[in-house]
């Protein structure tokens, strides 16, 4: 019974090397002209056939064991910026495997190389920069201690440039003096009630409120567009004989009348989500036409108006 089954490592159960595994999307010579076998057996036959011209350097090489991982960088195994060493396998090593989706510092500066070379050069550059920053920090710390007299000076340190002032400098006052602007901000009111020649008659970029007639103007910046829209809106209201209250200039409400929602001369703006008497029974006209003088006309009068 034991002689019926082949051994575990045999050409019957395992495809002999060299061969390509299924899913390999690279080029294999004469593969498109061969058929009748599995992908592994067919590529193994093509790669070992002496009659087929192919490159002497194989793309895939057999390597039963992964290469030893080297966790050392140029300049020794110093920690980055004084970071505490932690147990376990570090993520950033000198032999990075392609397909790693984590962040590699300085990798954007290197190109035209393989992933492993780019990762190695980027991490070496990053370590060198951090070591330089650590050296500068130690130098500043040493100079601070020397200026404060906490360390005895050597002959070389006595030749360093010395400051005339001791650090930290003493404070002249406990609290800073209050700052008062010479020309404080003065609110100028709503742009709707400004004169047409006023340069502030516009809305700044980023304003998300509704500006009448602005959707029909294109090709200019937002302040210029809103200025032209409000001027055009004012001219349209003048032709209709609608005048807005000037009480807002004196600190009053910006509306025509406080608490008034349904106007007699104008309809409501589109997308108004409030209640309009009799609107649900009307059709055949725009929202503004149907909501004009909502409290004065009956449903039959609104359907026959205009």
Curated annotation (Swiss-Prot):
One of its GO terms (cellular component) is axonemal microtubule. InterPro entries: CMI2A-C-like_dom. Its main location: cytoplasm. Expressed in airway epithelial cells. Pfam families: CMI2B-like. Residues 61-92 are annotated as: Disordered. It is found in: Cytoplasm, Cytoskeleton, Cilium axoneme. It comes from the Eukaryota. Keywords: Cell projection, Cytoplasm, Cytoskeleton. Transmembrane segments: none annotated. Microtubule inner protein (MIP) part of the dynein-decorated doublet microtubules (DMTs) in cilia axoneme, which is required for motile cilia beating. Belongs to the CIMIP2 family. This is Ciliary microtubule inner protein 2B. The gene is cimip2b.
């Amino acid at each position: 019974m034991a002689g019926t089954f082949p051994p575990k490592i045999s050409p019957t159960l395992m495809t002999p090397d060299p061969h390509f595994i299924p899913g390999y999307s690279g080029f294999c010579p004469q593969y498109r002209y061969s058929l009748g076998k599995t992908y592994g057996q067919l590529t193994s036959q093509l790669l070992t056939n002496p009659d087929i011209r192919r490159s002497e350097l194989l793309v895939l090489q057999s390597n039963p064991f992964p290469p030893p991982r080297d966790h050392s960088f140029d300049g020794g195994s110093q920690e980055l910026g004084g970071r505490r060493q932690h147990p376990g396998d570090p993520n950033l090593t000198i032999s990075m495997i392609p397909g790693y989706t984590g962040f590699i510092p300085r990798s954007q500066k290197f190109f035209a190389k393989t992933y492993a070379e780019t990762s190695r050069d980027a991490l070496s550059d990053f370590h060198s920069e951090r070591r330089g920053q650590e050296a500068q920090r130690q130098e500043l710390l040493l100079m601070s201690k020397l200026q404060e007299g906490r360390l005895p000076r050597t002959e070389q340190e006595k030749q360093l440039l010395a400051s005339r002032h001791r650090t930290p400098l003493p404070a002249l006052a406990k609290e800073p003096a209050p700052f008062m602007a010479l020309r404080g901000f003065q609110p100028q009111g709503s742009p709707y009630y400004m004169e047409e020649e006023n340069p502030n008659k516009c809305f700044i970029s980023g304003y998300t409120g509704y500006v009448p007639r602005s959707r029909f103007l294109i090709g200019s910046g937002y302040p210029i567009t809103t200025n032209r829209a409000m001027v055009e809106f004012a001219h349209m209201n003048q032709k209709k004989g609608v005048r807005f209250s000037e009480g807002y200039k004196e600190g009053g409400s910006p509306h025509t009348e406080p608490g008034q929602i349904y106007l007699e001369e104008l309809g409501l703006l589109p997308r108004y989500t409030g209640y309009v008497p009799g609107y649900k029974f009307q059709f055949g006209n725009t929202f503004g036409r149907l909501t004009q003088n909502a409290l004065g006309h009956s449903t039959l009068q609104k359907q026959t108006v205009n």
